[in-house]
């Protein structure tokens, strides 16, 4: 693979990681990290990050702006599809009944998947639509803060 391409992609990945982390999401990079968080009681929003255009243009901005709300999950975490493969695979084991999809969001409550917002519900939609989908999940499964 071309060295310039690798450098470019490393920069894209780093920017994508920084963007979601600065929004308040904890990076989970190992299967152990995933288990430690998702087995906890309460609600956890998992953002399955990606380098695709709909992740950067829609999903990550929605992940950030949806948090300007009174009803929120107990925890915000992210795994990076294609980068942190072990963590992503383990997270997907919790998403029973849903096909692998990135970018996407999964709301886990007490260690069990409640619902997902899959790529097809993100791609081709605008940021506000995805924010509304997230906040609908928050209203349904989370508590006011």
UniProtKB/Swiss-Prot annotation:
Record's Gene3D superfamilies?
Glutaredoxin
Q: Which Pfam families match?
A: Disulph_isomer (PF06491)
Question: Any one Gene Ontology biological process term?
Answer: cell redox homeostasis
Q: Which family does it belong to?
A: Belongs to the bacilliredoxin family.
Provide the protein name.
Answer: Bacilliredoxin SAOUHSC_01610
């Amino acid at each position: 693979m071309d060295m310039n391409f690798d450098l470019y992609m490393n920069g894209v990945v780093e920017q994508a990681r920084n963007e979601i982390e600065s929004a308040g999401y904890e990076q989970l990079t190992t299967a152990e990290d995933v288990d430690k968080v998702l087995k906890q009681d309460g609600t956890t929003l998992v953002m399955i990050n990606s380098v695709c255009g709909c992740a950067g243009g829609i999903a990550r901005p929605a992940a950030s702006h949806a948090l300007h709300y009174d009803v929120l999950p107990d925890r915000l975490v992210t795994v990076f599809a294609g980068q942190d493969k072990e963590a992503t695979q383990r997270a997907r084991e919790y998403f029973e009944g849903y096909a692998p999809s990135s970018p996407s969001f999964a709301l886990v409550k007490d260690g069990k998947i409640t619902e997902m917002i899959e790529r097809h519900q993100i791609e081709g939609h605008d940021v506000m639509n995805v924010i509304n989908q997230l906040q609908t999940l928050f209203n349904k499964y989370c508590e006011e803060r």
